[in-house]
Amino acid sequence: MTEKLLQMMQEKGYFNQHKKVLVAVSGGADSMSLLHFLYNHQKDLDIQLGIAHVNHKQRQESEYEENYLRHWAKEHKVPFHYSAFSGKFSENAARTFRYDFFKRIMKEADYSALVTAHHADDQAETIFMRLLRGSRLRHLSGICDVRSFGTGQIIRPFLHIPKDQLPVTFHFEDRSNSSLAYLRNRIRLTYLPTLSQENPKFKEHLCLLADEIALMDKALEELTKDITITDLSVFQQQTDAVQHLLIQSYLESFPDLQLSKGQFNQLMSFLRKKTSGKMPLKNGYVLVKTQTDFLITKEEPISLSSPSLLEFGKSIVFEEYLLTFSEPHVVSNVDTINIWSDAPIVIRHRHEGDRIDLGTHHKKIRRLFIDNKISEKDRQKAIIGEQDGQIIFLYVAGRLYLKKRPKNAILYGTVVIYKKF
């Protein structure tokens, strides 16, 4: 089985882009199996290991386990990174503490990936737990084997392997794993074994379901990539079913905003109406809707505010930027724009149908956002400069897009954009 595991990892290319990887090790069976496997196959996978361990200070044995791992790391010449949990303990608080610690070590010690020992049984448990809690369909895709994390990626190379097929090695037993006081333990020790008596492949089928949902979600993302979700004219042209999926996708940007079915339906009803306004949501969030756009935010965004007028010799503050319009000059390390007219410049956010003359062609601002993969958040903050009824510059996500220089034009002044701190 070890050779099959190695072959699978190589075929999937989990470590092709990584040299230094940080292995999360608790001392339990799964993480110790992962540690020994990766250590024994460092050359095959062309990686260098580091160990990250968090002592949660909840069991007497934790000190011994920490010392064992520290000694093992020293003996095998593997860097050992350690932290002790502090504060009021809960499962969520401990998880947040662990992953914040992992991110910090990745950044400080230049690891490009965190590797964890989640396996197929963990995947089945996660999906079943979400089913019990009434999660939406897209959340039943379960755990990803590779995704962005911190300054690199998190990789779960065992995710498609059942626990009973993992290499067996020395490990510590956490007695809390056998306590039925925890839902996940009840799922692992009671619910899934009972259902597996009806169908021995029940856990496997849960994982296959997750794979199908993940594929469907990926297909939806590709099919809707050119749709600006927060553009009302575009959104309202879609069918009810597509609108439903688009808003679910948009809500993924707000992980601490978990709407009930009733609240979700109210949100959809509000978006389908012709009226503008604000709708309070949960956790301090509000849905803000104008005649042309909408967005969810914790504060009413400047992107829905009135335009400002920038005149020659003056400065204005717009969002987190200070813009000045003065005599032609060069300023190092800031964004500068040459201006070919003395007319005041309207500083605003985008409107439906905005276009800019890039020289070789006119381009819709919306299409420019799509082609350059500008995020929804950055689109809302994009700054447009309009002079004499024409867009002369677009500033978005730290990038400038300029209107073609007028023929035979004489340089009149310079606009400088400073980021405020």
Swiss-Prot record:
Pfam families: ATP_bind_3
The EC number(s) this enzyme carries: 6.3.4.19
Domain of life the protein comes from: Bacteria
Record-linked SUPFAM superfamilies: Adenine nucleotide alpha hydrolases-like (SSF52402), PheT/TilS domain (SSF56037)
UniProt cross-references to InterPro entries, sorted A to Z: Lysidine-tRNA-synth_C (IPR012796), Rossmann-like_a/b/a_fold (IPR014729), TilS/TtcA_N (IPR011063), tRNA_Ile_lys_synt (IPR012094), tRNA_Ile_lys_synt_N (IPR012795)
Span of the signal peptide: none
Gene Ontology BP term (one): tRNA modification
Binding site for ATP: 26-31
Keyword field: ATP-binding, Cytoplasm, Ligase, Nucleotide-binding, tRNA processing
Top-level EC class as recorded in UniProt: ligase
Principal localisation: cytoplasm
GO molecular function, one term: tRNA(Ile)-lysidine synthase activity
Catalytic activity line of the entry: cytidine(34) in tRNA(Ile2) + L-lysine + ATP = lysidine(34) in tRNA(Ile2) + AMP + diphosphate + H(+)
Gene Ontology cellular-component terms listed: cytoplasm
Subcellular localization(s) per the UniProt record: Cytoplasm
Main function: Ligates lysine onto the cytidine present at position 34 of the AUA codon-specific tRNA(Ile) that contains the anticodon CAU, in an ATP-dependent manner. Cytidine is converted to lysidine, thus changing the amino acid specificity of the tRNA from methionine to isoleucine.
Entry similarity comment: Belongs to the tRNA(Ile)-lysidine synthase family.
Domain-related comment: The N-terminal region contains the highly conserved SGGXDS motif, predicted to be a P-loop motif involved in ATP binding.
The name this protein goes by in its record: tRNA(Ile)-lysidine synthase
Source organism of this protein record: Streptococcus thermophilus (strain ATCC BAA-250 / LMG 18311)
